[in-house]
Amino acid sequence: MGQKINPHGFRLGITTDWKSRWYADKQYADYVKEDVAIRKLLATGMERAGISKVEIERTRDRVRVDIHTARPGIVIGRRGAEADRIRAELEKLTGKQVQLNILEVKNPESDAQLVAQGVAEQLSNRVAFRRAMRKAIQSAMRSPNVKGIRVQCSGRLGGAEMSRSEFYREGRVPLHTLRADIDYGLYEAKTTFGRIGVKVWIYKGDIVGGKRELTAASAPAGDRDRPRRERPSRPRRSGSTGTTATSTEAGRAATAVVEAPAENQEG
């Protein structure tokens, strides 16, 4: 059920990698709890920074934290003051030396998490949800490496009494194909009517042998424009038994009567 499961977890070890990379024996539960606390710390108060993802690597006495953000200037701060504050809080939380790396996301309009955050911000600012979804789809499809996108909003859309879900899709989004490079993002918009969940799936081509294969771009123009082949005609079925019209004597006699006048006209 590729349509239901988280696309990152569905493809772990195939096309996607873990966001926490370390090994532990007896301290496994403590490290997982610590990773959740690190991500929660970076999420609070950094909404304007546009954080796409946080990757964590551990050694025996050091923790490496990579922050992928669309606005690195907000995370770094003036003369690195904000980065120093974040590093100090992380060292206090983990009790170890922290190596903080701030990496810029080159194409934020093709990053699913950042697209979801952008739609959620518009919903919080009372923008119509359909308009916000269409605008996000149009800006994402302008990127050359995006082959398809799906945006879904769930909750009390437009202040309705009953919550519902609506989605828009453009291009291909093959969620059950394991070799497909699917980027997934989830964010919640806080509105006066309650929370609205925003989910975004972005298809960026197939990954074959560790390399991304852009199926639409690599296919020749003749293959894309080729018309679909028509299926061969099947014999007619009659009755509930599924027998064909020519498998019984009555059926053969009826078809012979129909075909005879056509032969006379040709003669």
From Swiss-Prot:
Residues 222-233 have a biased composition (Basic and acidic residues). Keywords: Ribonucleoprotein, Ribosomal protein, RNA-binding, rRNA-binding. Residues 215-267 are annotated as: Disordered. GO terms for molecular function: mRNA binding; rRNA binding; structural constituent of ribosome. SMART domains: KH. Residues 238-256 have a biased composition (Low complexity). CDD domains: KH-II_30S_S3 (cd02412). Signal peptide: none annotated. GO terms for cellular component: cytosolic small ribosomal subunit. It comes from the Bacteria. Residues 38-106 form the KH type-2 domain. Part of the 30S ribosomal subunit. Forms a tight complex with proteins S10 and S14. Belongs to the universal ribosomal protein uS3 family. Binds the lower part of the 30S subunit head. Binds mRNA in the 70S ribosome, positioning it for translation. This is Small ribosomal subunit protein uS3. It comes from Nocardia farcinica (strain IFM 10152).
